[in-house]
């Protein structure tokens, strides 16, 4: 399934990272109990899907591998939040769609994108239009593959956090002896 998708679209796997549970757990305290959450870059074995369901949320998940492209598809069922980890290569398109949908959202992206001119310009325009960016910044560079992470990934949010910037403490960075991989990797080989 995933292998075919990458081949058909001439993509490389470096754009596909599976979020560890450690990062999913950080956002849960900011969500209203029993809410419905759309995870648009996820499969049934995604840590977002599994851990949000375990925490009592109803989860709608979709993935481009299944023909449900976030940029062109939206679930018919109503949802309260959009939460996921989108592909880095389409970050600006994802952010544009998220603000257009006008739903509270939280997506994981690297903090360095704030330095990208196109992203900075986009956030400035959103601010001028009354749309506020919020950040949930974790205090460690979290590893997605067990190796040392090269930059900090945090949540970019809108209409979700009680304050525009919140810092969160993590007990470890999910590398080496603390590494726990995402169960979504199971879906890659299917």
Model-found features: residue ranges?
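Class I S-adenosyl-L-methionine-dependent methyltransferase catalytic core
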Residues: 1-190
